[in-house]
């Protein structure tokens, strides 16, 4: 069947045969190499990346500038998405933030996180009130401290 998708977990763990004078230069090379590999193999590459610590001290949603070790991640990627959930919130709502999309729109999608199954569930806006009422009284397995 062949290769249909390549997932890297995570970018900063990849080692190279060449020695670089900084992690920034190494991640830049890895990012560009993955972009070339995607073109060569004609498959999508999903590369997870660490964020720098500024997002923790600043609070709020992550930004493109929070990608750790290199601006080339932002530059090379066709799409950059973040998963964000307010740690202070009691809600199981998680946000998928589409911060860059070379060929499409950016924006946000809200999903419900089911910690007992480690899955995200799409919920339409009109269902949020019903979901909140059910989650509060039914013991349906949605646990908000597993994310």
Predicted segments, located by residue:
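C-terminal regions of RecA-like/P-loop NTPase motor modules
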Residues: 1-5, 32-42, 53-147
């Amino acid at each position: 069947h062949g290769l249909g998708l390549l997932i890297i977990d995570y970018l900063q763990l990849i080692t190279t045969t060449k020695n670089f004078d900084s992690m920034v230069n190494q991640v830049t090379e890895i990012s560009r190499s993955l972009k070339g590999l995607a073109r060569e193999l004609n498959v999508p590459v999903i590369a997870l990346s660490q964020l720098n610590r500024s997002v923790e001290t600043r609070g709020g949603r992550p930004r493109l500038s929070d990608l750790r070790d290199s601006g080339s991640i932002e530059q090379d990627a066709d799409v950059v998405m973040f998963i964000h959930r307010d740690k202070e919130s009691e809600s199981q709502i998680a946000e998928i933030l589409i911060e860059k999309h070379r060929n499409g729109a950016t924006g946000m999608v809200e999903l419900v996180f089911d910690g007992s199954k480690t899955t995200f569930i799409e919920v339409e806006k009109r269902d949020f009130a019903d979901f909140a009422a059910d989650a509060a009284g039914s013991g349906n397995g949605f646990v908000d401290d597993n994310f």
